[in-house]
A protein has these predicted regions:
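Positively charged n-region of N-terminal signal peptides that target proteins for export
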Residues: 1-4
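Sec/Tat signal peptide C-region and signal peptidase I cleavage site
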Residues: 18-22
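Short, solvent-exposed loop/turn segments at secondary-structure junctions
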Residues: 41-42, 90, 116-117, 199-201, ...
């Protein structure tokens, strides 16, 4: 009887492992539906948004923040698979509450660059994206962080994989990108770092994943302007992150950045 129970337990563990792998990289089920948020930063939104029209198996809608923030509420997960956020916008407490409830329900979230500055005054946001820009020395969970310092906007940043087995980083070549370099921000200790840098003027954790309720979260520090956006490696990472956040297979046969 004991041997039988042990065998059943082993089978259950094996099945759970298979289920986890399938959930990690599920086969395609139609196009990935993406909602892209922009606004508040002053960059050329059309250049950034145009990238999504060139990505295979993806359809996107662009909305302006904070004007259309009320769209981010429970029920949106039935219309979209992933939200890609590139805005820097302050939203109301009511809108933040609805947005938090949506994320808890489960929708993929890809947060890029200055989006960590969004939702000013909503402390929960740092728990969602796993990081925070500290305008001044800030105490978080008993430790002091900041102030965040900018070294430049077109600094050569060398990026390497921190976890070569993660779907977003697997088979991704090292690359260098000219981008905004900043450091001394807050990064939560429990995020899973996917990409890193040893560029001393830059935050070492370049990109990482987290979980917020049922929401898969990916945040990347890169992407200040067109010079970064036009780097093939940036497009590759963004494409992989969207697929991962949607629970889809990450096609590693697609562009591998030089």
């Amino acid at each position: 009887m004991k041997h039988g129970c042990a065998a059943l337990l082993g089978l259950a563990v094996a099945l759970a492992s298979v289920a986890w792998v399938q959930a990690e990289e599920a086969p395609a089920k139609g196009k990935i539906r993406v909602l892209v948020t922009v606004g508040g930063h002053g960059f050329d939104e059309n250049v950034f948004a145009a990238k999504f029209g060139k990505m295979p198996d993806l359809e996107y809608t662009k909305i302006q923040m904070p004007q259309q923030a009320k769209m981010l509420k429970p029920g949106l997960e039935k219309e979209y698979d992933v939200i890609v956020m590139f805005d820097w916008a302050k939203t109301s407490a009511e809108d933040n509450k609805s947005f938090g409830e949506l994320l808890q329900r489960g929708i993929g979230l890809v947060s890029m660059h200055a989006n960590l500055l969004s939702h000013e005054g909503w402390d929960e946001w740092r728990k969602v994206v796993g990081c925070k820009w500290c305008f001044k020395e800030t105490e978080i969970d008993g430790k002091k962080h900041g102030p965040t310092q900018i070294a430049g906007y077109t600094v050569p940043i060398k990026v390497t994989a921190a976890d070569k087995e993660h779907p977003i980083a697997r088979d991704l070549a090292d690359f260098t990108i000219a981008d905004e370099a900043f450091r001394n921000g807050y990064v939560a200790p429990d995020v899973h770092v996917v990409l890193k840098t040893d560029t001393t003027t830059c935050q070492p954790q370049v990109a990482f994943t987290a979980q917020y309720g049922k929401c898969r979260v990916f945040h990347c520090m890169l992407g200040h302007g067109a010079e970064a956006w036009n780097n093939p490696a940036f497009t590759d990472v963004l494409d992989r992150a969207i697929r991962w956040a949607a629970g889809r297979a990450v096609d590693r046969a697609v562009r591998n950045s030089p």
